[in-house]
Swiss-Prot record:
CDD domains referenced in this protein's UniProt entry, alphabetically: Ribosomal_L16_L10e (cd01433)
Signal peptide start-end: none
PANTHER family, alphabetized: 50S/60S RIBOSOMAL PROTEIN L16, LARGE RIBOSOMAL SUBUNIT PROTEIN UL16M
Annotated protein name in UniProt: Large ribosomal subunit protein uL16
Lineage: Bacteria, Pseudomonadati, Rhodothermota, Rhodothermia, Rhodothermales
Domain of life: Bacteria
Family: Belongs to the universal ribosomal protein uL16 family.
Function text: Binds 23S rRNA and is also seen to make contacts with the A and possibly P site tRNAs.
RNA-binding found in the keyword field: yes
GO biological process, one term: translation
Sequence ranges of Basic and acidic residues compositional bias: 76-95
Pfam families from the UniProt entry: Ribosomal_L16
GO cellular component: cytosolic large ribosomal subunit
HAMAP family, per database record: Ribosomal_uL16
Amino acid sequence: MLEPKDTKHRKVQRNQGLKRNKYAVKGTRLSFGDYGLKSLEEGEVNSRQLEAARVAINRYLKRDGKVWIRVFPDKPKTKTPAETRMGKGKGEPEHFVAPVQPGNVIFEVGGGADEESAREALRLGKHKLPLKTKFVVRPGSRAEE
């Protein structure tokens, strides 16, 4: 599963400020493949969900195409044990999540995959994610012709 090798701080503070941008500014265009899965809502995707979606996409594509994961789970989520009294500090890091904003590309497919198989592979992968997503095609690619 995906997680950072080493972090400067084990735990992160919660974001208390207002969101400056409602939609993603970076990571909104396809960079590697001809087809992609773009987020339509804000949320967090953990490393297990990303891995499950990647496996589902790769199983369908077999060796016909290549898959790129465009988000990385680098934000630690902490949890205190059940039935613990108040105080005693913040809990231990449990898993890592990738914050996703509307417009972020989560997966890309290319490298010889045709549109029909890429669409079906990404459809299978999107069912593993907790966000609404849509299928996108790179403008000006051979897929649009």
